[in-house]
């Protein structure tokens, strides 16, 4: 009774799908029937899924990621499915007697087969016959359970929740709420672009992912342990010995379990090193969610005594520019990334630590060494260098991005083959495949927009109004700075608090300071979704300056003429700059804003909007290179590196940039 089918009934155990039938697969459209069901499993929170009803399909099909692994069993007989190119694929797993609730009523499904189709759950004709008569209206359908009609509303906006980490997050001991799924778009997709979703190609991705995933970061079968590192002392004769800590009975028990796990995995060994640093257990938010404290070694003394690694980590905004115009993403997380880097014998001795069980040293790079992020970044960039047009890596986080799903299949396959070649181990439960919306480096990237994930805002609001000391204040300002792109006039907002961090300022926290922090948190009710400009969009910056602050906005004008906000930026003038003439401050504001947005503005032609009437004149005039005009000459030369047009913006119209420099307390 629907316009599309997954499997057409043929001979027993043999089904066929043609390309036109693929047209509406995994799409929400008026001719498709989606209903909401609820699944409950022992040890898991109950959760909702959107089920696709297809009377032309002979079987009920479910994703492996919404039914616990232990409930899947080998099918007594392989089911062969013929797909569009006449090739056969096998369905080998079945879940028996599955109970699903629809409209509050429990329905039992004798057999549900496992297959990744891009849909969480497909209800086939066998279910419709079992609970017949099946009736449908414009906005609802009906099945019959024990001669009673059960009315079920259709879902007009369907979502898919299945991903490798979904069930892990739904365990009862997990504090993670059910994460909203990915919208099943109503756009009509070219059949060829959906082709891989149920062909052997998608299965190849799943199989390849299984090959490179493990719970052991130095898996003896999968890891090639090609990543090596060496840590050197500044003074080769120096011995680092930090006094051991005392531990509670509970901590001793926690250490015993973790030390045994690390020994069993081959990550640490007993040590006779003359160096030693103390280990301790921490319980932050992530640890509380897992219900398990995490062992950390205090390597402060070692870090001060060893030579650093100067390999730079990628700039966040430069990474974002690579995602411009991309519509489909996959992300991967290296399993305990630093532990995949093997240390030489002398370096292992430097990592020696003390705990209740004795003296141990790491065979791999431990968390806490200052060199660790740079070492791992270098190795990952070396491995993935050939995939840099569609893949980027930030330490142990990998994201793959594409314009179409067919391209994306090829890109993901290429990245996973590189990972397999080098023996890099990934985390299966943190893998996200073929998503329109994805979280990466604390940002939510969704259909051409980006904003910080909810936990960033939650972290800001978790800070008490009264901050205890300078370190506490630094942490609060650090979280604000992380989200500076999304907070207008941040420079002005944080200035009254920043002065308290000066070395010559004695710590003194007053009630007015607490009120100010409270006001900041109140004004940050949510983060805006900012636009990620496409390569063909025309870019515009709007700038403004006040006596003490500068501000700017990056906007993009699409082909339809609509202008969207991409980024905010603001800052404060240095003490010497505060003495500049107002015209010079306006010029400096433009310079600062272009610098902040340079990753987007090079090498394209863009527009500068400013309410400074003298800016165009400044760019044209032939300045003398004497001491009075030396700074302006340097600025002229600096501006000449960029290609832009200037639009004069009346002050009353310069609302966006002006709001970044206006008094926060006004």
Swiss-Prot record:
Q: Which residues form the Reverse transcriptase domain?
A: 215-445
Is Nucleotidyltransferase one of the keywords UniProt gives this record?
yes
Active-site residue numbers = 54
Answer yes or no on keyword Transferase: yes
Q: Which reaction does it catalyse?
A: DNA(n) + a 2'-deoxyribonucleoside 5'-triphosphate = DNA(n+1) + diphosphate
| InterPro entries, per the entry | DNA/RNA_pol_sf (IPR043502), Pept_A3A (IPR000588), Peptidase_aspartic_dom_sf (IPR021109), Rev_trsase/Diguanyl_cyclase (IPR043128), RT_dom (IPR000477), RT_RNaseH (IPR041373), Viral_Replic_Matur_Polypro (IPR051320)
Give the EC number(s) listed in the UniProt record. 3.4.23.-, 2.7.7.49
Which one GO biological process term can you cite for this protein? proteolysis
**Swiss-Prot/TrEMBL keywords:** Aspartyl protease, Endonuclease, Hydrolase, Nuclease, Nucleotidyltransferase, Protease, RNA-directed DNA polymerase, Transferase
According to the UniProt entry, its GO molecular function terms are: aspartic-type endopeptidase activity; endonuclease activity; RNA-directed DNA polymerase activity
Query: Which Gene3D superfamilies does the protein's record reference?
Result: 3.30.70.270, Acid Proteases, HIV Type 1 Reverse Transcriptase, subunit A, domain 1
- Fill in the domain comment: The polymerase/reverse transcriptase (RT) and ribonuclease H (RH) domains are structured in five subdomains: finger, palm, thumb, connection and RNase H. Within the palm subdomain, the 'primer grip' region is thought to be involved in the positioning of the primer terminus for accommodating the incoming nucleotide. The RH domain stabilizes the association of RT with primer-template.
What family does the database annotate? Belongs to the caulimoviridae enzymatic polyprotein family.
In its UniProt entry, what is this protein called? Enzymatic polyprotein
What is the species of this protein? Answer: Figwort mosaic virus (strain DxS)
């Amino acid at each position: 009774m629907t316009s599309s089918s997954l499997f057409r009934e043929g001979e027993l155990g043999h089904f066929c799908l043609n390309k036109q039938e693929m047209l509406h697969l995994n799409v929400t459209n008026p001719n498709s029937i989606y209903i909401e069901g609820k699944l409950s499993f022992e040890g898991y929170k109950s959760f909702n899924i959107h089920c696709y009803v297809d009377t032309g399909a002979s079987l009920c099909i479910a994703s492996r990621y919404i039914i616990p692994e232990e409930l899947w069993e080998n099918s007594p007989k392989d089911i062969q499915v013929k797909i569009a190119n006449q090739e056969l694929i096998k369905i080998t797993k079945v879940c028996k007697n599955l109970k699903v609730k629809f409209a509050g009523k429990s329905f039992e499904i004798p057999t549900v087969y496992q297959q990744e189709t891009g849909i969480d759950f497909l209800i086939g004709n066998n279910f419709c016959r079992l609970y017949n008569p099946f009736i449908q209206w414009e906005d609802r359908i009906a099945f019959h359970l024990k001669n009673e009609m059960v009315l079920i509303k259709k879902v007009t906006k369907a979502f898919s929740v299945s991903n490798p980490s979904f069930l892990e997050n739904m365990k009862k001991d997990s504090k993670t709420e059910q994460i909203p799924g990915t919208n099943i778009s109503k756009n009509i997709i070219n059949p060829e672009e959906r082709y891989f979703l149920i062909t052997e190609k998608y299965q190849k991705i799943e199989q390849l992912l299984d090959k490179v995933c493990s719970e052991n970061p130095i898996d003896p079968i999968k890891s090639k342990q090609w990543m090596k590192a060496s840590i050197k002392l500044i003074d080769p004769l120096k011995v680092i010995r930090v006094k051991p800590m005392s531990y509670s009975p509970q901590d001793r028990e926690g250490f015993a379990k973790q030390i045994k796990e690390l020994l069993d995995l081959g990550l640490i060994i007993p040590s006779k090193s003359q160096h030693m640093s103390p280990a301790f257990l921490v319980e932050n938010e992530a640890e509380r969610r897992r219900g398990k404290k995490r062992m950390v070694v205090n390597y402060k003394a070692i870090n001060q005594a060893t030579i650093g690694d100067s390999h730079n980590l990628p700039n966040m905004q430069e990474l974002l520019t690579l995602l411009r115009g991309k519509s489909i993403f996959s992300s991967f997380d290296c399993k305990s990334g630093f532990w995949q880097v093997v240390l030489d014998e002398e370096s292992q001795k430097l990592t020696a630590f003390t705990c209740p069980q004795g003296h141990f040293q790491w065979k791999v790079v431990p968390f806490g060494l200052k060199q660790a992020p740079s070492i791992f970044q270098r190795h990952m960039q070396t491995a993935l260098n050939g995939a840099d047009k569609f893949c980027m890596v930030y330490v142990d986080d990998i994201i793959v991005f594409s314009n179409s799903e067919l391209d994306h299949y090829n890109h993901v396959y290429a990245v996973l083959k590189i990972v397999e070649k080098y023996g890099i181990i990934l985390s299966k439960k943190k893998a996200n495949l073929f998503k329109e919306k994805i979280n990466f480096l604390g940002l939510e990237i969704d259909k051409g927009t980006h904003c910080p994930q909810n936990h960033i805002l939650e972290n800001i609001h978790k800070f008490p109004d009264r901050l205890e000391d300078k370190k506490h204040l630094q942490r609060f300002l650090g979280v604000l700075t992380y989200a500076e792109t999304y907070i207008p006039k941040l420079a002005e907002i944080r200035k009254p608090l920043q002065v308290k961090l000066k070395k010559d300022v004695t710590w003194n926290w007053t009630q007015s300071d607490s009120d100010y922090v409270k006001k900041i948190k109140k004004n940050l009710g949510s983060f805006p979704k900012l636009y990620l400009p496409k390569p063909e969009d025309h870019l515009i910056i709007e700038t403004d300056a006040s006596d003490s602050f500068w501000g700017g906005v990056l906007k993009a004008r699409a082909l339809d003429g609509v202008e969207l906000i991409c980024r905010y930026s603001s800052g404060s003038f240095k003490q010497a700059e505060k003495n500049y003439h107002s015209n010079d401050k306006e010029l400096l504001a433009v310079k600062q804003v272009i610098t902040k947005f340079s990753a987007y503005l090079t090498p394209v032609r863009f527009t500068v909007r400013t309410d400074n009437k003298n800016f165009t004149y400044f760019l044209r005039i032939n300045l003398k290179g004497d001491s009075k005009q030396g700074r302006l000459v340097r600025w002229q030369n600096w501006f000449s590196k960029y290609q832009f047009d200037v639009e004069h913006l009346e002050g009353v119209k310069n609302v966006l940039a002006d709001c970044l420099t206006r008094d926060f307390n006004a």
